[in-house]
A protein has these predicted regions:
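Short beta-strand or tight-loop elements
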Residues: 3, 20-22, 69
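Glycine-rich beta-strand-centered segment in the early N-terminal region that forms part
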Residues: 25-43, 54-94, 100, 112, ...
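Cytochrome P450 core scaffold surrounding the K-helix E-X-X-R motif
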Residues: 46-51
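Terminal peptide-recognition signature
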Residues: 7, 38, 135
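Short gly/ser/thr-rich secondary-structure transition/capping motifs
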Residues: 15-21, 54-55
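NAD(P)H dinucleotide-binding glycine-rich loop of Rossmann-like/cofactor-binding domains
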Residues: 90-138
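Short structural boundary motif marking the start of a folded domain
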Residues: 2-8, 34
């Protein structure tokens, strides 16, 4: 992993809201015990609201949206995940309360992840996302 990578960062200072792709480093990622190289991230309705104006969904700025993502574990301090594990992250208020998947790398709590089934590609795993999984339950 290189020291710097790109992330879509939203920020709000007073009444001024901004969004831009920025170069950040691993230390910018605040939460979690598993570092993931993000391969795909879906566009969720909440992501669209956050990208529009923060939509009062984000409590702390700057912030990286992206409620759903899939990728490969790069580093882990969680006993359930090791380097090379292919994962999916959806829900748990990732992208709202925690930095999300609109970044080349994401750092999240291991309990937010599931191992991706081998018969499902990273891209396929993002087709449904949180919204699709919610609809299935209705």
């Amino acid at each position: 992993m290189s020291d710097n990578f790109k992330a879509l960062v939203v920020n709000q200072e007073g009444d001024k809201f901004s969004r831009e792709v920025k170069s950040v480093n691993k230390e910018f990622l605040k939460h979690g015990d598993v570092l993931v190289k993000v391969e795909y991230s879906g566009l969720n309705y909440k992501d669209a609201l956050i990208l529009k104006n923060g939509a009062k969904l984000v409590k702390e700025f700057p912030h990286i949206p992206g409620i759903d993502f899939s990728g490969t574990v790069v580093e882990s301090k969680n006993e359930n995940y090791k380097q090379g594990d292919e994962i999916i992250c959806t829900g748990w208020r990732v992208g709202e309360l925690y930095y999300g998947g609109y970044s080349q790398y994401a750092k999240v709590k291991g309990e937010f992840l599931v191992k991706r089934p081998k018969n499902l590609s990273a891209k396929q795993s993002m087709i449904l996302g949180t919204a699709g999984l919610t609809a299935i339950q209705c």
